[in-house]
Amino acid sequence: MKEFRTEIKVTPSTQAVQFKTGILTQGSCFSDAIGHRLATYKLRTLVNPFGVIYNPESIHKVLQYGIFNEPVPEHTYLRNSEVFLNYDFHSEFSALKKEDIVSSILNTIGSTHYFLTDAGWLLLTYGTAWVYRRKDTGEIVANCHKLPSDMFTKSLMTADEVSSSFKTFYGQLKKFNPAIKIILTVSPVRHLKDTLELNSVSKSVLRVACHQLATQFEDVEYFPSYEMMLDDLRDYRFYKSDMLHPTEDAEDYIWEKFMERYFSPELKDFVKRWKVILSAIRHKPFHPETASHRQFLLDTLKKLDDLKTQVDVQQEITLVKQQLTKSS
């Protein structure tokens, strides 16, 4: 039968993700989408610890803070409308008192440093090659925090600049954790504020840089989430109403491809078993007091008990026991 779509076929990676592998994700909101799915399936995951960040230079910079475990420079802090923020971080790092945001950032740097010491994988999702520089320092910022536009200059990073920034970061990371492997992705989210034409230019820069880096380093891989959205799914029904962000169905499709490529056979087997348990836990019966539902909960509890030597399922066990108590 003739094929009516251009599906991207993935092959298993030679370096599979194992069960106890630590995975850190950082980058655009697509890093959140993948990271939270990793966490849902009980992998040891640190998801976008520094908040959503779009450009490669800023992504590398916050992770460098994590590697060196040092306070961020004083000149990166700012105050806008009585709120303290930081140019290098997402606005989720904000406070009415400066000492509070400093403490929050330092705690995040410390936890990231600790996680990176033995993490097996780092997933970086680049969102845009467009960057904003402070006019007073010339530094690229992760977030302009709604400050006047005349305080910044906008420019497009070149593929060589992205690669150079990555290589500096890569050298520091590998010195800190020689065993860590890196997955590069380009976010499938479209940046309409740059216009569709310039969004294409930006994504092209990121894609070329990722190709160069994945070709140059054996422990750096490219995962084609961007191409899966544009060339495989290729339909507006897979975009949310803003026509910029992938729907949950699209994210699930890309997630399935991600698992197909990177998960070990043992991990894939666990995912199948965990899906059944998740479905059972989320099930909302019409008549929870029936004997059949009570047996359903007891069966689920047995499945959880069988897995507790592999992963921490105490939260799920507690939840099912609470449901059993209510059904008595």
Predicted regions and their residues:
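Extracellular glycan-modifying ectodomains
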Residues: 1-328
